[in-house]
């Protein structure tokens, strides 16, 4: 089993923590996107793009309701950032998590995963995210509510149509 598949399974397993909190799979994927962005900035030594005091380690070093309230404020502050990319990622961001203990558990689990094994592999993090989107799509009414297009089909359509730069293909 590849490390990406293993990590996707672990991340998807964490969704069960939030299911009882009323968080849908689609909301979980969005929540995970925010947390993984913060974690990977830390892992890659790119924390400097984030405002001081609003970085992964600042979040990890808090627990319970203090962490929960900080996370909510953090999402707002990052959405108000003057940095174009941060603002676009976090604009109008909010958390769907209601219980502070669930956020703490999720952050602890994410922090304990072995990211080094996949981050430098070809397609590593992109494949990880694609795996999560696929699982979300497969959840039917509770998930994305749409069909997930398998990578093999996407590659075949691209190969057969031979799109030029700037052209768009819809599936």
Language-model segments: residues:
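Non-catalytic, mostly N-terminal accessory regions of nucleic-acid modification and defense proteins
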Residues: 1-165
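Class I SAM-dependent methyltransferase core
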Residues: 171
